[in-house]
């Protein structure tokens, strides 16, 4: 689903920017002391397990939007 994938990528990018602002950097293994995290890569380079985590967050967000009574309608092509 295009919207789920777009939201999942955004979720990851927002998370990564937050970590970077907190001083975290990429590292092959998570290291709290050195503030290294293997997930600090572009979304496209994540493995499917990590992408699925972000997709789950995106789906949860879409469910909340629907529960609140909103609908998402794509733009019509001109």
Task: Give the residues covered by each predicted segment.
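Alpha-helical propensity feature that highlights long, continuous alpha-helices across diverse contexts
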Residues: 1-78
